[in-house]
Amino acid sequence: MVCPNSNPVVEKVCELYEQISRLENLSPSKDVNVLFTDLVHTCMPPNPIDVSKLCQKIQEIRSHLIKLCGQAEGLLESHFSKILSSYENPLQHLHIFPYFDNYIKLSLLEYNILTKNTTNIPKKIAFIGSGPLPLTSLVLATKHLKTTCFHNYDIDVDANFMASALVAADPDMSSRMTFHTADVMDVTCALKDYDVVFLAALVGMDKEDKVKVVDHLAKYMSPGATLMLRSAHGARAFLYPVLDPRDLRGFEVLSVYHPTDEVINSVIIARKLPVPSVPLLDGLGAYVLPSKCACAEIHAFNPLNKMNLVEEFALEE
């Protein structure tokens, strides 16, 4: 495995990594914004690079860089979620988020892929890893899926509190948006209720963790339900984890789309396969058995009445 140090993109990414890793904090600031904007622009152009073939040193840099990107993205979303919540109707001001247009394009892309591969409008969607500014759910709910209920899952209670505040003033959105504080690995029975599950790009910060999440979803999602995943391709894999479609055990991969514009994430859509009546051997020699559902209690924010409930995720013009 040869490390292509002569590759100018890899060299530029490593240079930016050194500068980013020296920052005292990753909260929005001029220096943070300039460095991450430069990083995105460096990784955005289509590039045949296969990050899995890079040397160990670059692999370690990539792994750490993805974590730094995730931290910076979370801080940026929290910053703008707080600003938006100061408006009387936050949903009318989502455009102030600097990457809002990217979410408009990504949501349209995902909606088109979803409608091409499914026959019915989903009644209930789960978004795993929704964060303090759940733009995908908000854009899909307001522009494309206007009768669908969205259940947003995040492990961070503060993120859910901020997100729920954004829809509290809107009667329609607050009635269709629910926010659950939970680790997805603890969510079992509830997953059977969703027609579509979205998995955010930064849920599972490396391939191993992401595959564990996918395997968990395969255990508990209903047969025939749809899984939408975000991955990365080429140099964009320095920004987000990569998920190989071959790692989607228990799912039939329907389509994989790699954007070449400013939409960074690749999109994978898959369908949950039926559970075999006779246990089958998986690739590791272990039996794949139908799972027994042990319901857990998960606290959800209901922004309509602000009470806590107990409940068990080619672009067309």
UniProtKB/Swiss-Prot annotation:
Its EC number is 2.5.1.43. Keywords: S-adenosyl-L-methionine, Transferase. It holds the Pfam family NAS. It catalyses: 3 S-adenosyl-L-methionine = nicotianamine + 3 S-methyl-5'-thioadenosine + 3 H(+). It is an enzyme of class 2 (transferase). Changing residue 238 to S: In chloronerva; has no activity. The keyword Metal-binding does not apply. Leaves and roots. GO terms for molecular function: nicotianamine synthase activity. Induction: Expression independent of the iron status. GO terms for biological process: nicotianamine biosynthetic process. Homomultimer. Belongs to the nicotianamine synthase (NAS)-like family. Synthesizes nicotianamine, a polyamine that serves as a sensor for the physiological iron status within the plant, and/or might be involved in the transport of iron. This is Nicotianamine synthase.
